[in-house]
Amino acid sequence: MHISDITHPNQLHGLSIRQLEDVARQIREKHLQTIAATGGHLGPGLGVVELTIALYQTLDLDRDKVTWDVGHQAYPHKMLTGRYKNFHTLRQKDGIAGYLKRCESKFDHFGAGHASTSISAALGMALARDAQGEDYKVVAVIGDGALTGGMALEAINHAGHLPHTNLMVVLNDNEMSISPNVGAISRYLNKVRLSDPVQFLADNLEEQFKHLPFFGDSLSPEMERVKEGMKRLAVSKVGAVIEELGFKYFGPIDGHNLQELISTFKQAHKVTGPVLVHVATVKGKGYELAEKDQVGYHAQSPFNLATGKAIPSSKPKPPSYAKVFAHTLTTLAENNPKIIGITAAMATGTGLDKLQAKLPKQYIDVGIAEQHAVTLAGGLACEGMRPVVAIYSTFLQRAYDQVLHDVCIQNLPVFFCMDRAGIVGADGPTHQGMYDIAYLRCIPNMTIMAPKDEAELQRMIVTGVNYTDGPIAMRYPRGNGIGVPLMEEGWEPLPIGKGEILRNGDDLLILGYGTMVNTALQAAETLREHGIEATVVNARFVKPLDTELILPLAQRIGKVVTLEEGCLMGGFGSAVAEAFSDHNVLVPLKRFGVPDRLVDHATPDQSKADLGLTSPQIAEQILQVFFSNRQPSMVS
């Protein structure tokens, strides 16, 4: 059977092991071809092909429910649920999402983007099933490091106290998240999986017996039984721990052996109460380069499938903001042993792997544990250290109480460096970083800044590291800088709460924040062509806002525009409007940013165009709002 003929996962039921293996081969081929062309998450999906096929071969997906953790594991799931023919549109505008979306397929039973959510959602479904007198199966597939997250452990703790609630948890144990897993739980699983001396003895016992007189090869069947018994002894320790938590335990089993997977899943489905199936997989399975470099091939930009090398850009690009951040912070840390970089399992993405390589004693990876990362930073700050929490904007949401309760209320000097702030592109709504201004600005003691370019990023890093009057946050975007020269030394901190005038004009005041400052300058040049001269201000800080600069300019010029790459509700424009209201500055104000809606997956440029945030669109709207009697429309 060709996988393109599979439009429903129940079609797997009648297939032989050989046919299922052929389906697995086709899934891997499509997966590799698509990611090589479009970019996206490569390693996670390759590791769960057989797991997905075997699980769905034992379920009735017209009734049964499956929740997937960190949805980039679910690419094989998407192909088996009627999306194979459109899989080439993965992460493209109007195409298939890179994560699970309930609105995309009836088989996406729960949306997933962030880690450690699957067991909680599945348990909720199981309890709803029982309350309504139904009897379908509910399965949570968790892995790629997500079991290190506290939320997953909270769900296991709850489920283990419900002995009559049928729930299956499948642990996809590939020893990895994005980077190698850290922490005691991961280390314990790895001991069971790889290094137990009893397991080693079982694996080598038969070879030793072959060298003894009278035995030779004659004991093979008996030896297999001995080996299996010893292996069961080897894994009984982790099984005992899981069963102490209230779960029946199966495993670990070979995550790439369809026969073993199907047999184990069928047994596990018969269990009353919660059950955990421990599946050992290889991240990147089937693509040798990804198996050897599981961190590098977790996610890829478009690449050459034969060589594994990224397809070069048609023209050289400036360094990414993450790369500039990593270089600058590492340089500062070399001269300041109190600087400690903290990441929550995102060392490569944030650039902190560079700090780890050069100054490992000044680097901490807490695993998928954002709440712990923030309070840990608070403890470090209490004792005079300079903690720098490098985290994606979307993931800091997960530690909001810790930011407020543990850091801001105590006014501790923790430096939050929020990567991927603003519009992130192909990862879509679950990963957009457009809410941080709003959710941080309302917290007392918090200072918030954003650089207009990569050189100003360097100065803001110096500012944050040297700021000791309380917590401070810096937001910066995904992707490359705009190409301004970088400084290798002589960095000076910025004055807190002070912006700068970049361009003078008497007809309009444009206040830009962060990445939108460059857009403001471009829009101002377009307006000049229509006889309109604008003053452009780089605000730098949204809190404290530079009212000493902004308010007199607003009163003198009389027309004000704000630009931000973030949500309008509670954002930079709202801060300006509040300042105008508080100081009785009665001037017309037009705010540009992200309205009260979700932003789907697309390229950042496509999303900005959809939101009316390109410089031509902004200039057009300014003309319509403030100068409609002066010039005809420029944009069709």
Swiss-Prot record:
Q: How is the cofactor bound?
A: Binds 1 Mg(2+) ion per subunit.
Q: In which residues is thiamine diphosphate bound?
A: 72, 113-115, 145-146, 174, 287, 370
Record bears the keyword Aminoacyl-tRNA synthetase: no
- Name the enzyme group at the top EC level: transferase
The pathway it acts in is: Metabolic intermediate biosynthesis; 1-deoxy-D-xylulose 5-phosphate biosynthesis; 1-deoxy-D-xylulose 5-phosphate from D-glyceraldehyde 3-phosphate and pyruvate: step 1/1
Q: Which SMART domains match?
A: Transket_pyr
A cellular component term from Gene Ontology for this protein is: cytosol
What catalytic activity is recorded? D-glyceraldehyde 3-phosphate + pyruvate + H(+) = 1-deoxy-D-xylulose 5-phosphate + CO2
Needed co-factor(s): Mg(2+); thiamine diphosphate
Q: Which Pfam families match?
A: DXP_synthase_N, Transket_pyr, Transketolase_C
Instruction: Write out the residues that bind Mg(2+).
Output: 144, 174
Instruction: Tell me the keywords, alphabetical order.
Output: Isoprene biosynthesis, Magnesium, Metal-binding, Thiamine biosynthesis, Thiamine pyrophosphate, Transferase
Keyword check for Magnesium: yes
Molecular function per GO:
1-deoxy-D-xylulose-5-phosphate synthase activity; magnesium ion binding; thiamine pyrophosphate binding
Return the Gene3D superfamilies for the record.
3.40.50.920, 3.40.50.970
Which N-terminal stretch is annotated as signal sequence?
A: none
According to its UniProt entry, the protein's GO biological process terms are: 1-deoxy-D-xylulose 5-phosphate biosynthetic process; isopentenyl diphosphate biosynthetic process, methylerythritol 4-phosphate pathway; terpenoid biosynthetic process; thiamine biosynthetic process
What EC number(s) does the entry state? 2.2.1.7
Q: How does it assemble?
A: Homodimer.
Role, per record:
Catalyzes the acyloin condensation reaction between C atoms 2 and 3 of pyruvate and glyceraldehyde 3-phosphate to yield 1-deoxy-D-xylulose-5-phosphate (DXP).
Hey, which family's this protein in? Belongs to the transketolase family. DXPS subfamily.
Which protein, by its recorded name, is this? 1-deoxy-D-xylulose-5-phosphate synthase
Instruction: Give the organism's phylogenetic lineage.
Output: Bacteria, Bacillati, Cyanobacteriota, Cyanophyceae, Oscillatoriophycideae
